[in-house]
Amino acid sequence: MEKEMRNLMLLVLLTVILDNGIGKCNAKSEEDQDGNARNNRIDKNDDNSDSIEKYLREVTDELSKILAKRIYRDIQLRENNKKAENRQSWIGDLENLDIDSTVQRPPGLWGREADFDNTRAHDSAQISDEKQSGLWVGDAKPPGLWGRDAKPPGLWGRDAKPPGLWGRDAKPPGLWGRDAKPPGLWGRDAKPPGLWGRDAKPPGLWGRDAKPPGLWGGDAKPPGLWGRDAKPPGLWGRDAKPPGLWGRDAKPPGLWGRDAKPPGLWGRDAKPPGLWGRDTKPPGLWGRDAKPPGLWGRDAKPPSLWSKDNNVIKSRSDDAKPPGLWGRQVEDGPTKIWGDGFLDAERHIRLLKNDERFNRLEKKADMEEELRVAQGPSVTNAKDTFGELADLLRKRIVKRLHKNDSLNNRRNNKKNNKF
């Protein structure tokens, strides 16, 4: 690029010199020659000057186009190198993940919003009562359940390219897109050994209409060799419906296209058997609107929910928020709590024992309960303290609700800005 810039500057300098030389020649000819000769010389010099300037303009324009292309290509190359470095750095971060760091992440779990305390998640002996795997609150991303931005092993977002699972354009070994040509699996135009397309002529084959044993022409579909429209076992096109598969288009086990719905992973509109809820709720993996057992969203109403007013477990209240039950708008406690299903009030408060404010309120409630037992049933301070606990938890829920709404709004705006 520096060489082209230097050449361009030399051309500009040459243009200036030629302009000055032509002007001096014109002045000298006017002094030495008579009127007719002077006019003829001026006309001739003007013609030469115009032709030279025209040639220089053409050369300069052509070099400018070449230089612009070089600059654009250099910018694109730098951006691609930067993306490659960022991707390599991301992969290196995953490989060098330190689970003993300040912010802990259990093995096999990565996400932008995952947040764990200093408990070593991989050591089962150090997992306390509130660290029961299987259900996470708030923005935590447990293994086997991932949010929109989480990147667990074996399941990635639109642009990620992990080993074993790729997007639309990726070409991993063993799984290929429309134009890829892997060994053992071929597209329309591929020419692998032992399998040929329409025009291929492998050694030992026969003419167009011949029908040797074990090899068929025309529209025949022999076992083990398939043409463009053939449907071999284990591999189906977009519209093929093999036995045992389900979903909107084609869903073969082990190989999935753009619209395929493999077992255990369903899209927004897929309705596999045994699922429930408003949209798609497969067991073990949930989408944006999914409602797994023990975890309910905005509109779900599980049995035996907490009452909003008196903090008592009731049957199905409209605005109830049971402890241990977290949806899109429900706040987790001051510490990360795991559990299966929802918990009663006493267990929920006991699991919050590591928080100082809850611990202080619980001790105060115990002291007031002892005082009530000693003085008689007229003392009701213990009940008020437990009500204060419930109010504090409710404030946490409302605060988290607003935080999640603002985060979702930012994500939606960012997604809309991309398109």
Curated annotation (Swiss-Prot):
GO cellular component annotations of the record? extracellular region
Q: What is its main location?
A: secreted
Entry's localization field = Secreted
| Region feature Disordered, mapped onto this chain | 27-48, 120-332
Q: Which ranges are annotated Basic and acidic residues under compositional bias?
A: 120-132
PTM Tryptophan amide: at which residues?
A: 110, 146, 156, 166, 176, 186, 196, 206, 216, 226, 236, 246, 256, 266, 276, 286, 296, 326
For this chain's UniProt record, which GO biological process terms are given? Answer: neuropeptide signaling pathway
Let me know which tissues express this protein, per UniProt: In planula larvae, expressed in a narrow ring of ectodermal neurosensory cells around the widest circumference at the anterior of the larvae. In primary polyps, expression is confined to endodermal cells of the hypostome. In mature polyps, expression is strong in the epidermis from the tentacle level to the base of the polyp and weak in the gastrodermal cells in the apical hypostome.
Its keywords, alphabetically, are:
Amidation, Cleavage on pair of basic residues, Neuropeptide, Repeat, Secreted, Signal
Leader peptide range in chain numbering: 1-27
Give TM segment ranges. none
**Which residues are processed away as propeptide to yield the mature protein?**
28-104, 113-140, 149-150, 159-160, 169-170, 179-180, 189-190, 199-200, 209-210, 218-220, 229-230, 239-240, 249-250, 259-260, 269-270, 279-280, 289-290, 299-300, 309-320, 329-419
What function does this protein fulfil? LWamide peptides may be involved in induction of metamorphosis.
Q: Which family would the database say this protein is a member of?
A: Belongs to the LWamide neuropeptide family.
Q: How is this protein named in the record?
A: LWamide neuropeptides
What organism is this sequence from? Answer: Hydractinia echinata (Snail fur)
